């Protein structure tokens, strides 16, 4: 059994990172949606730390009473982490809005010349009992999680396709979330 995983053990550095010592992200350009906070912000942070140019997008422009962070507070924190060779950009962008997506992509291309990857993290989730779920909530989740994610990914993919390279990472709820009785019982629509 030990020999089976020897290649993995050899690739793990002392800092427990599987990434190569010389970052393959240096100079690469990534766009991260839903990056005002949480998973999106932390992915953007790691990309910046590894030397990538990062454009973050999100809808939260003003402080929210229940949610931490704005696109501008995230930008400030990421700029403090970046080196002089990498750029960090931020745009308020609703991934359901083709005009805002085009502005984000065009400005990113204007500054960095290419898009090497996109992280599709923006989402909407309304956790209500299926019988309590409103049409408005279902429409919001469908328009963001399906239509918006598809539209934003498609537009970024067009530019990556021209470069004949690129990476796309789509964030989804954890699998174990779906295997609890409580999840299935109370949130059938969201599953």
Please provide the spans of the model-predicted regions:
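Conserved glycine-rich cofactor-binding loop
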Residues: 29, 36-37
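Conserved glycine-rich Rossmann-like NAD(P)H-binding loop of the short-chain dehydrogenase/reductase
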Residues: 52-73
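Catalytic Tyr-X3-Lys loop
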Residues: 116, 124, 131-150, 165, ...
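Amphipathic alpha-helical dimer-interface segment in Rossmann-like NAD(P)H-dependent oxidoreductases
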Residues: 110, 144-162, 176
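The beta1-alpha1 cofactor-binding region of Rossmann-like NAD(H)/NADP(H)-dependent oxidoreductases
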Residues: 91-103, 135
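Conserved mid-core segment of classical short-chain dehydrogenase/reductases
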Residues: 68, 102, 125-139, 180-187
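Non-catalytic terminal and boundary segments that flank Rossmann-like NAD(P)-dependent oxidoreductase
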Residues: 1-29
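Catalytic loop of short-chain dehydrogenase/reductase
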Residues: 169-191
